[in-house]
Amino acid sequence: MSFLDILLGKPLATADERAEQIGTAAGIPIFGLDALSSAAYGPEAALTLLIPLGAMGIRYIVPVSACIIVLLAIVHFSYRQTIAAYPGGGGSYTVASANLGKFPGLVAAAALMIDYILVVAVGISAGVGALVSAVPKLQPHTLSLCLGILAVIMLVNLRGVREAGIVFMAPTFLFLATLLGTVLVGTVKTVFAAGHPVAVVAPPPPLVVPLVTAASAWVLLQAFANGCTAMTGVEAVSNGVRAFREPTVRNAQRTLSVIIGLLIVLLAGIAYLVRAYGIAATDPGKSGYQSVLSMLVSAVAGRGWFYYVTIGSILVILSLSANTAFADFPRLCRAVAQNNFLPHSFGFRGRRLVYTEGIVVLAILSGILLLVFGGVTDRLIPLFAIGAFLAFTLSQAGMVAHWKRVKGRGAIHSMIVNGLGAVATGITLLIVLVAKFASGAWVSALLIVGLISLMLWVRHHYDQVSQEVAISSPLSIVSLGAPLVIVPINQWGRVAQRALQFALTLSQNVRVVHVATEDETNALQKEWHRMVEVPVERAGGKPPKLITLPSPYRLVLTPILDYVQQAEKENPDSQIAIIVPELVEKHWYHYPLHNQRAELLKALILLNGCTRIVLVNVPWYIKA
């Protein structure tokens, strides 16, 4: 078994694709980790904005969470319809491009790509940050831990969709079991205590502030905007419909409903218990900081084994939340590449039937972010949710146009559902933009514009290439004369002999060029007449010319390139074939033992850009 087989698994045939498809159980960790993990930081993000209100701020977490839950429900029903209408994968890019046009589609694609890169970097950083706060000795190794987790997630995803689902299933279900258990036990205690439960471990008291009778609309809008980070990753299932086994649409819809249902239960339960237990957020930048979930689990269950298992599962899930981006980003890139807005290589599936290039590129870009910020990406959090809500809005608006065009039974009802989704997410997008603009949302806008410009440039290049190589006339064989053949060699041997034999089958006009070096030139000239000219003449052929090129500065490639350019000018009506003899080693570690002149020569000739030059490799395989 090769090293690659051990690292990535044995290659899968296209016929194995059905076996790699997944059901709901595997779909939850693959496509739902990002959304579900947001229960660990979404409510806290909203509560952090309410810290200045003291105890009064805790009262507002329930209505703020209720607004987010209503929005989640609307988006859920909207995306169920998108999955049914686009069973081949109906992400925001596909829907917006098909129904609103090319540019809105690119906006949706760029917004989602940037959001996915942020999800990976910030998710891993948040998980490692929580681990470091629990084990301070690990603080110097923050960046190494981040990059290590990133590498593991990348490798698991390169092994295939099904295997990724199996690997991430256990930590996902442990996270859900412990957090749902906390919500259930806490709710029962609250109900039996008539809404005033006694905490096992009392949370720190809220910030003492002057009497506040009500929160300003601006503070509540900011809290809502921060809490909307809980909705990132909701779209992933609609992009990955083809990953599900038959019945594809039903399995994808069921998975989406389970993910959204679980997230709603978690958000509602956390908000309810936070208010019941009087838990306020603490300032992350000050000593004594505790996460909201840490205080909540302590209040409900104390600081025993259950607390540590729950907090441990949260740390793991925060780190692994990046997996949703690894499942969706490559599929999005493939869809964009199919329309020539990204390199076509993004559309090719690798040895394990996954889009390898998309996975690797996402890991590299996220790794760069982690390197730049030293593994601490708190400053990137304000950029969150902008891309997601922009994509949500364009997708839902596209579905409205879709139902308007398709019509038929149920079209009006579907149009109303998607229209409501478009309005709700559009309003939320404006709120998030206004609330977060000063703290970094403008950076997202610039990045989206830059990425769209890059994609348009790629499309322009492909259009130019397509226009240049396209042909409508049939094959013409008129005026096809024998080419001028040039064979560069450095000494006489089996490699040179094989190249020369092939050259003589193409044309009688063969020139062998040799760059002068004192020892090799003398030896070659002595052998040329006996080893080449005499045998060719005896066979009735025209002996090839041996042309020795001077090189006073000991350059090898430049004299050959100059000679080729000169031959091109002297033979304006002829094709020129350059036969490049090359040694091919059996093992990769032998290549550094040889010079790489053949490869460099080919590169230089190709860069020369003459359309009449044809390069031909004649390999000699080393058997030893």
Where are each of the predicted segments found?
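Helix-loop-helix junctions that connect adjacent transmembrane segments
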Residues: 173, 178-230, 435, 439, ...
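Loop-to-transmembrane helix boundary motifs in multi-pass membrane proteins
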Residues: 102, 140-147, 243-265, 337-371, ...
